[in-house]
Structure formats: structure tokens, C-alpha cells
Amino acid sequence: ILASVGEPDLSTTVFGQKIDLPIFLSPTAMQRLYHHDGDKASARAAEKFGTFYSMSTMATSSIEEIANISGGPKLFQLYIHKDQGLTDNLIDRCKSSGFKAMCLTVDTVVAGNRERDHRWGFTTPPKLTLKSLMSFAMHPMWAFNYLTNKKFELANVSHWTKKGSSIAKGVMDYINEQYDPAMSWKDAEYVAVSYTHLRAHETHEN
């Protein structure tokens, strides 16, 4: 009561970084499926409003590309890969590119049965089928932008594995082949030591 709201201040501090809004963008994979500017547009918007941009391992722009276009605070969503070298590569690149924090994702050690994806034959990048051709025809501007911009790829991992390149691959197949189902607290400890700011997932048991 009678707390002055003449000049409200929504700013807060997250991971030691002051941000202008008490919210930030969650990591979203494969944003170029929705718009040809994808991750870059999201990073610019987050910087404009003074909050964190969160990048998915499965982004369609690279860590370095985002670092070059955005001076705002950035967080990286990390998956533990079966290939430790790839996990280390992602951590090192984030540190070199000035990402302020890292979020270790632990809910994808086994891919879910996404029946809609199976039904529609969803792959990344999209492959040509009768259904997809009909969808492209109904969205001509999306199809034009997709065809006239750089090739679709999982830009953070395509240099390391062909399964992140322009070869059409089911997302669940990629997860099952690349992510480590044996991930444990030892992996979380390893990432925490490797990267100072690791966002923790807390439960009563943990």
C-alpha cells in the first residue's frame, strides 16, 4: 500500500546479469522452420528489450552468428551428446562468444513418441513429399524465403556430424542417435565445472 508506482522498474538480476524485464526468451529449436530470420530475429528482439536470448543446441544459426549480431545477454541450452568432443566444443564456443549462462537440458535422454511428427513425416530439413508440397503451395512466401536463403541445417553441430547438416532426418531419430541416455549427475558436475553459471533444476529429491 502506498508504494510509489510513478516510475515502475521491472528490471531484475539473473545469473549476475541485470535485465530490463523479469522474463526472457526460452530456447526454441529450428526457428527457421517458422521464419527465415529465425534465431537472429529472436536475438535482436531480446537485445532490444534488454533481456536474455536463449539459444538451443538445435538452432539454425550458429553460436558465433548470434554473438556477432547481438550484444545483449545470451544463454545456451546444452544437450549432453554421446560424443564428448562435441559437448566440449559447444561449451568452449559459448565461452569464447560471451554467452553469460548455460542451461543443461536433461529431459531428452529418450525421445518422446511424437505421433503427429510420425504422421506428417516431419524431418529437418523438410523433405519433399506430396503433403509437404501441398503445404509449400499454400504458403508461397515461406517457400520462397526457404529456397532463397542459406541451406537449412542445425548450425551448431553440422560441422561435427552429417546428421546435423542438410540431410533430411527425423528429429526423434537425431535425438536417439546423438544424445546420451546414460547422462547422470556426473555430467551435470562436469558442465558446472566447465561453465561457471549453470542453471539448476531443483526438485524435492535433488
Language model segments and positions:
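N-terminal capping/small domains of soluble enzymes
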Residues: 1-109
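Conserved phosphate-coordination/catalytic loops
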Residues: 57, 81, 178-185
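Glycine/aspartate-rich loop-and-adjacent alpha/beta segment that forms the canonical ThDP
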Residues: 110-128
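An N-cap/entry alpha-helix motif that binds or orients negatively charged groups
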Residues: 1-17, 125-183
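Alpha-helix-loop-beta-strand connector modules within alpha/beta enzyme cores
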Residues: 68-73, 186-188, 193-195
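Glycine-rich, aromatic-flanked loop segments that form ligand/cofactor-binding clefts
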Residues: 107-111, 149-152
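Conserved small/polar residues in nucleotide/adenosyl-binding loops
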Residues: 196-203
